[in-house]
Structure formats: structure tokens, C-alpha cells
Amino acid sequence: MEKAYKLLSVQENISHKKAKALIDSGLVSIGGQKLMVARKELPQNTRFSVQKVEKPSVIFEDENILALFKPPFIESYDLVSFFKGWALLHRLDKETSGVILLVKENSEFHLKAKKAFKDRAVKKEYLAIVQGIIEEEREINAPILTIKTTKAFSKISKKGQEAVTIITPLKIINKKTLLKVGIKTGRTHQIRVHLKHINHPIIGDTLYNNEPSSAKRLMLHAHKIALLGYEFEAIAPKEFEI
């Protein structure tokens, strides 16, 4: 028996640090199941599958705004290293894919865009695949409290901030539902927490879903966003074609 990250470092011919980072990023699986603990003791003959990370791509660019497709497993804050001179306008969770916006920092448009977010004048639409069958549109209105330590964790609490999510079923197959999701507020992990709250957690959510899954990622995609006369769409990856 040996620690997982040490075995992975030998298989991939990489450092222990790099092996740990790959496991912590959710990019390593064994027999179709995601490996969650880098120090887990495993047999010497264990074989790992390592998922490759895509690079972000440009959806649209002008003098005001840069709309990108963010692949899963890339931190939003790392995007500025790919696109110099631009600043993040908002963020997506690391495992969430989809459209994300950057602007020229402290420009007139940046100030207007920040105000649009503050005034809830930004329209966002997500796609999510959840456990179980949801047959009707519904609104989830439950306050969310976020606890921030080394990693953020949110939960439903009377002490939390207002949070409203609207879900619409698009397709049902094999006891899973593909949802269109709209949010009226923007709390940390809002969609993930609200869907867990109604007992339909997102498939592949290792933080809020305890059920084992063969999904290689969190099945949440930022599909569309509109603000200040702009509207952008990121086509959903093939894994959303259920």
C-alpha cells in the first residue's frame, strides 16, 4: 500500500506537489470514480485516469468587455494570466464551466457594470443536471449563510442573506433532470446549496452531494449572461447532452 499522490507521481512522472494538486483539483479518477483524498492508501498496482484541462477561449471582445468560455477546473482568478490588461467582473466556481466576463479595470464601463450587478440588473442563466425527477418550474427562496475559512461553504440559515433561484426542467432521463436555472441574487454556491436544499443536488458536486457519481465534474454550466445591452452565450459541453 502507498499514498495515492506518490503512486500518481510515479505513473505520470511528475512531482509529489503536482500529483497532490491534480487530485485536489478533482482531475484524477480510479475506475471511473473521482479520487478525493491525495493521502489515501492504495495498492501499488492502482492505475489512475487524469483528465486534461482545456484552455479558455474568446466568445466576444470589444473595447469594453471580454466574454470568455471558462472550462471546468480553472480558477476564475487565473483567467487574467491568460488575458493581460483585463480584470474579472464576476466569478464562477472552479468546476463550473461557461461564460464569464472581464473588463478594463476602473474604466467607465467597469463602473457601470459593477453597478448593474449591485442593482441586480444582470440576467444570468445556467444549466444543471441534478439527481431525481423535477417535473415543474419552481422558485426556491431560502436565505444562505456563507462560512469562509480556507474554502467557502454555504448553507441554508435564517441568519443568512436573501437568495432566490428559479428552476425549469428541460429534460428528464434515467432519474436525472436537466434544468434551466435563473438566479435573482448571487450568493456563494447559491445554485448548489438551493438544489441540495430541495433534495435534488447537482450531479458531481463533491461539496454538497454525498452520493457517489461517475461524473468527472460538477454538472453546472453558466449558459447565458446579459447586461448593459450585451448578451452572451456559451454552448454547453457534450456531457450536458443527456
From Swiss-Prot:
Keywords: Isomerase, RNA-binding. It catalyses: a uridine in RNA = a pseudouridine in RNA. The active site is at residue 93. InterPro entries: PsdUridine_synth_cat_dom_sf, PsdUridine_synth_RluA-like_CS, PsdUridine_synth_RsuA/RluA, RluA_PseudoU_synthase. SUPFAM superfamilies: Pseudouridine synthase. The keyword Isomerase applies. GO terms for molecular function: catalytic activity, acting on RNA; pseudouridine synthase activity; RNA binding. It is an enzyme of class 5 (isomerase). Its EC number is 5.4.99.-. Belongs to the pseudouridine synthase RluA family. This is Uncharacterized RNA pseudouridine synthase jhp_0890. It comes from Helicobacter pylori (strain J99 / ATCC 700824) (Campylobacter pylori J99).
